[in-house]
C-alpha cells in the first residue's frame, strides 16, 4: 500500500493510463483480426476497406504514447506486406 500522497496519486494515474492503453490496444487487436480474417478468406476488397482503420488505430496509439513509433511502423509494415503478398498471388494466378 502506498504511504505518501504522491504515491497514492501515481497509483491512480497509472490505473487510468492502463485502462486507456488497453482500449487503444484492444482496437488495434480487433481491427487487425478483422483484416487478417478477410485476407485468409481471400476477401481482398474488404481487407482494403478495413486497412485504413487498422493503420489509424495504430497511429493514434503511437501518437498517444501507448505504442513506440518503431513498433507502430513495424506493425503497419507487416500488414501492408501481407496485403501486397495476397495481391501479387491473386494477380499471378
UniProtKB/Swiss-Prot annotation:
GO annotations of cellular component type: cytosol; small ribosomal subunit
Alphabetized InterPro entries for the sequence: Ribosomal_bS20 (IPR002583), Ribosomal_bS20_sf (IPR036510)
Keyword terms: Ribonucleoprotein, Ribosomal protein, RNA-binding, rRNA-binding
Record keyword Kinase present: no
One MF term in the entry's GO annotations: structural constituent of ribosome
UniProt GO BP: translation
Similarity-based family: Belongs to the bacterial ribosomal protein bS20 family.
Role description: Binds directly to 16S ribosomal RNA.
Protein name: Small ribosomal subunit protein bS20
Name of the gene: rpsT
